[in-house]
């Protein structure tokens, strides 16, 4: 509670107490104290509840008929009938004193509640005490004014000092009413001011927490020197900044080891404007060369593939205690800032997938660029032939081709070793072939018996992810070799053609090749096989023991 509010409450209480005291003096007149009374005439002392005459007093009564004690009405202001009516009202003097006393108690209780109770609970209590105090004070004023008027009309012109003190009592009771409004209104304002002061002490106000200290305010400089790579920032951390104030500062999101070409990327929390469109425009303006639109799109597309996700939490400026640094592009230290047509090799872009020290709920996700559909197919074709890291892809492709158990037969040629090991027919042809005589199929050819050796099981490779199932050594001859030896349609001798053929080949068997036609070993070759052939690498089928490269 502020000092001015306390002064007003003090004036209210003092006025109520003085009014109560004056009314109490009027209440204890004769016959209680025979020396004092409202009026003295003809040795008769008139009081509130009786009178005293020549040392003897009457019994206390609320109406002792003061109009009958005098023989003549000429000595009084009013006649006997009026004085008889007023004599019945004079007993309200102690009631007026009691009402002012209750108002005085309400004032004291209001002061105590405002000082003791907390600010969130004192509001309702103060409102209740205001209405109660106002009610008692109003009734006390009315009763004090009434008794003052009655006494003067009844005993005038023979009044004593006890009658005169009723006038200031009534006046003070009238003054109490506006003082009550002022006191409670100031107390409500003082509570708001106290809450404001508490908030100012805690530093929770944002408008002007330091009213008297100019050096304690925030030092905001819009044109400060904290400009990092073209990004103007606000100097929120001045020399006079208080330690108790919390403020959020946006960290420097541009990493120190970032590629210079990526410095134009704008980091924003909204996705209204595509940052990749800005990126392409900035590169076009910075290069100043006459690149056409198609080359510009290709350059932007290649650049988009080299970007990776940035995390503020895992950046070097996000944490002070050694968070994982996020590298945008790792290209083995090659300088690509001047080469605008540089393409990032596939598989070389590394993205940190480890969680940050602050939280493990965040995951690294690759940035999904806006790709140009018109350039996508051309980029794939150029990548397949002009990939910078061909050695790595060739080694992986050859390894997968050799050790894979699921490979299309149409993409493999005939194994030369197995082809050379197959028996050849003589010029005369086989001796046991019979002419075609209505047989559905010609008789099987008889070749010299060749001892079939079961294939040796390949040693288990180092990487078990390519072995889809465990292979077992067949118990008998290979069915494919038996079919090749017993069916004349699989006679692949270069100079010998079977003498008799079935005009309509059987279902599931391919016709024999022409006499002068060599075995077809060429077919569709993917890009990685063409690179293998250019580098004189042997095929994977040359190390196997069957024509189709089965294992």
Curated annotation (Swiss-Prot):
It is a multi-pass membrane protein. One of its GO terms (biological process) is exocytosis. Residues 29-88, 157-160 are vacuolar. GO terms for cellular component: cell division site; cell periphery; fungal-type vacuole; fungal-type vacuole lumen; growing cell tip; plasma membrane; vacuolar membrane. The keyword Cell membrane applies. The chain crosses the membrane at residues 8-28, 89-109, 136-156, 161-181. InterPro entries: pH-response_reg_palI/RIM9, SUR7/Rim9-like_fungi. Its main location: membrane. This is Uncharacterized membrane protein TOS7.
């Amino acid at each position: 509670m502020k000092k001015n509010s306390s002064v007003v409450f003090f004036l209210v209480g003092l006025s109520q107490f003085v009014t109560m005291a004056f009314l109490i003096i009027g209440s204890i007149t004769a016959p209680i104290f025979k020396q004092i009374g409202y009026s003295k005439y003809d040795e008769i002392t008139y009081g509130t509840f009786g009178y005293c005459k020549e040392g003897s007093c009457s019994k206390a009564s609320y109406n002792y008929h003061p109009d009958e004690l005098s023989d003549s009405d000429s000595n009084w202001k009013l006649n006997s009938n009026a004085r008889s009516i007023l004599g019945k009202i004079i007993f309200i003097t102690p009631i007026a004193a009691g009402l002012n006393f209750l108002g005085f108690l309400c004032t004291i209780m209001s002061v105590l509640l405002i000082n003791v109770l907390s600010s969130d609970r004192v509001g309702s209590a103060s409102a209740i005490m205001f209405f109660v105090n106002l009610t008692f004070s109003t009734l006390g004023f009315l009763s004090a004014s009434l008794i003052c008027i009655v006494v003067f009309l009844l005993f005038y012109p023979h009044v004593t000092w006890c009658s005169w003190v009723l006038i200031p009592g009534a006046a003070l009771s009238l003054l109490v009413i506006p003082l009550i409004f002022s006191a409670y209104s100031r107390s409500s304002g003082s509570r708001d001011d106290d809450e404001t002061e508490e908030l100012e002490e805690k530093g929770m106000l944002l408008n002007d927490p330091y009213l008297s200290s100019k050096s304690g305010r925030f030092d905001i400089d819009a044109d400060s020197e904290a400009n990092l790579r073209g990004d103007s920032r606000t100097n929120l951390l001045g020399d006079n900044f208080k330690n108790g104030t919390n403020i959020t500062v946006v960290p420097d999101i541009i990493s120190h080891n970032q590629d210079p070409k990526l410095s134009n990327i704008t980091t924003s929390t909204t996705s209204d404007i595509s940052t990749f469109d800005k990126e392409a425009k900035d590169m076009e303006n910075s290069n100043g060369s006459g690149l056409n639109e198609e080359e510009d799109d290709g350059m932007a597309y290649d650049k988009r593939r080299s970007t990776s996700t940035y995390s503020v939490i895992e950046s070097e400026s996000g944490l002070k205690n050694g968070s994982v640094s996020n590298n945008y592009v790792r290209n083995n230290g090659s300088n690509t800032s001047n080469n605008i047509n540089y393409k990032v090799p596939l598989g070389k872009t590394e993205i940190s997938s480890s969680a940050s020290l602050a939280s493990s709920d965040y995951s690294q996700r690759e940035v999904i660029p806006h790709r140009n559909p018109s350039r996508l197919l051309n980029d794939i074709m150029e990548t397949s032939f002009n990939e910078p890291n061909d050695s790595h892809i060739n080694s992986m492709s050859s390894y997968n081709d050799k050790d894979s158990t699921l490979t299309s037969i149409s993409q493999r040629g005939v194994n030369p070793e197995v082809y050379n090991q197959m028996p050849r027919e003589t010029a005369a042809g086989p001796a046991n072939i019979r002419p075609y005589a209505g047989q559905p199929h010609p008789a099987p050819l008889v070749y010299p018996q060749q001892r079939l050796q079961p294939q040796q099981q390949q040693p288990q490779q180092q990487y078990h992810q390519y072995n889809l199932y465990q292979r077992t050594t067949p118990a008998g001859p290979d069915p494919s070799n038996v079919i090749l030896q017993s069916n004349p349609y699989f006679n692949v001798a270069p100079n010998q053609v079977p003498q008799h053929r079935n005009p309509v080949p059987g279902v599931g068997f391919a016709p024999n090749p022409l006499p002068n036609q060599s075995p077809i070993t060429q077919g569709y070759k993917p890009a990685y096989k063409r690179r293998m052939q250019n580098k004189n690498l042997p095929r994977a089928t040359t190390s196997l023991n069957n024509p189709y490269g089965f294992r």
